[in-house]
UniProtKB/Swiss-Prot annotation:
Native source organism of the sequence: Vibrio parahaemolyticus serotype O3:K6 (strain RIMD 2210633)
Matches recorded under CDD domains: HisF (cd04731)
Protein name: Imidazole glycerol phosphate synthase subunit HisF
EC number: 4.3.2.10
Main location: cytoplasm
EC main group: lyase
Length: 257
């Protein structure tokens, strides 16, 4: 059985790590490189970096820090933010990232998923999906430009349909960002994860809502996700990654120690 992954997520804005609640009101957490190094040393399996305003600003991830991160960590990392072409992706991979993740650009141009998968292989193409539960309609809707409060908007896609579409086009992994839970620390949306898991045949990463160690265990045991991503609980040292892995092991969950 493949080990379940623990993935700290670092939202980057203007060269610093920031964190919001439900994608709003971001506060500065600190510098990118020391934080990345700390997580690698604590036992993270992988890191994900989101340049959260790159897509809405119409630019690509600022590359200077990607190379600096690659120099100090020896675990895989994924970079997202405004990647609109194979050239953009190639540059980030050349700087040392192991994977690239696309979100809003994939919604604008779904063919991009196929182009990147064909050129670099599906194993390094991740699609991020920002999913919002609309209480009025009872539906999970895909949103885009979520890094910019003024431009965030619903798309025509329902989450389940978009999950199927991106797989058809070559996504090698899916990160499901559950917007209602983001930064609230009340647990992952297990119901939504199960709905997506039914149609998701590639690795599925849960994102949004982790507040306690048992939330990670729930996501693995009740929704069979391949990895769980979290930010605020790690940034604010509410949960130590090494201790989390020991806890998960005690729950009978396969993790890399």
């Amino acid at each position: 059985m493949l080990a379940k992954r623990i993935i700290p997520c670092l939202d980057v804005r203007d060269g610093q790590v920031v964190k919001g609640v439900q994608f709003r009101n971001h506060e500065i957490i600190g510098d990118i490189v020391p934080l990345a190094k700390r997580y690698a040393e604590e036992g993270a399996d992988e890191l994900v970096f989101y340049d959260i305003t790159a897509s809405s600003d119409g630019r690509v991830v600022d590359k200077s820090w990607v190379a600096r991160v690659a120099e100090v960590i020896d675990i895989p990392f994924c970079v997202a933010g405004g990647i609109k072409s194979a050239e953009d992706a190639a540059r980030i991979l050349e700087f040392g990232a192991d994977k690239v993740s696309i979100n809003s650009p994939a919604l604008a141009n779904p063919q991009l998923i196929t182009d990147l998968a064909d050129k670099f292989g599906v194993q390094c193409i991740v699609v991020g999906i920002d999913s919002y539960y609309d209480k009025d309609t009872g539906k999970y809707q895909v949103y885009q430009f979520t890094g910019d409060e003024e431009r965030t908007k619903a798309t025509k896609w329902e989450t389940r349909d978009w999950v199927q579409e991106v797989q058809k086009r070559g996504a090698g992994e899916i990160v499901l960002n559950m917007m209602n839970q983001d930064g609230v620390r009340s647990g992952y949306d297990i119901e939504q994860l199960n709905m997506v898991r039914e149609v998701c045949k590639v690795p599925l990463i849960a994102s949004g809502g982790a507040g306690a160690m048992e939330h990670f265990a729930e996501a693995y045991q009740k929704a069979n996700v391949d990895g769980a991503l979290a930010a605020s609980v790690f940034h604010k040292q509410v949960i130590n990654i090494g201790e989390l892995k020991q806890y998960l092991k005690q729950q009978g969950i396969e993790v890399r120690l």
